[in-house]
Amino acid sequence: MAALRVALVGIGKIAVDQHVPALRGSADWELACTVSRKGTVDGVQAFADMASMLEARPDVQVVSLALPPMPRFVAAEAALKSGRHVLLEKPPGATLAEVHALQALAAERGLTLFATWHSRMAHAVFPAKAWLADKTITRAHITWREDVRKWHPGQDWVFEPGGMGVFDPGINALSILTEILPAAVHLQSAELEFPANRQTPIAARLAFSGNVTADFDWRQEGPQTWDIEVETTAGRLDLRMGGNVLEIDGQPAGGQNTIMGEYPALYARMAKLIAAGQSDVDLAPMVHVADALTLGRRVIVDDFFF
């Protein structure tokens, strides 16, 4: 089968670090062009806006959106209306309603819409889900602590309305949680820490039904922590390295100590969805974030500056 031609929109850090290597490493894909106000990729045709690209490149079959959440709906809608399949970087939108609208539009046009959760593609997530499938969960806890200055250097949009703040990484943990637990949980309470000079939280503590809790923090320097621990009546499971390393009862049980397999797996999944004429839009992780911002008790903390 001929490679699918894709336009990559939003050439920032995540596009350069993850999307471009994944596309260039796959026979399923051809990075046909990019769209970005500033960023470019060497050797690839570049456009400054979506309208110009859509008009000039009718041969592009797929649009992959690595834009921040706020401008993503307009770009996704334009791509779908022009007959292109669409891949959405996480989170899939700034609001739940706009993603539902995109889902309806894709279905109406017979196009594939893939709302991606890259952390679900981590090496140990599937075996963790399989191990937990017949277990009785007694407790689960997420510790997701990283350094915003490392992962979003100078990117003030993450602290603007719609940027999600610490839920930008935290939603990755929630995407794993909602994938591996054998039964659904719902949020019961939350405490959110907002820097006095910012619009979104820099830390969050969440409590769910089923004795499930989470601790998110964007101020951790040095080694980063992306762990999920699950206790059951039959033993303990730990996911480390963002879902890439699995331990059962404290012993290594699979996975790989790298995050570089997630995006190749996303694009492989997208190619299969297009071939099958299907879409994949699961908003469960985003529902938990929306609930946290609805239920959360606000705590003001020190100003934050990059």
What does each model-identified segment do?
Residues 1-42, 306:
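N-terminal Rossmann-like dinucleotide-binding module
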Residues 63, 140, 212:
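Receiver (REC) domain switch-region micro-motif
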Residues 44-103:
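Beta-loop-alpha module in the N-terminal Rossmann-like domain of NAD(P)-dependent dehydrogenases
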Residues 194-199, 209-272, 278-283:
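NAD(P)-dinucleotide binding in Rossmann-like oxidoreductases
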Residues 1, 52, 62-65, 269-306:
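C-terminal helix-rich "cap/oligomerization" subdomain common to oxidoreductases
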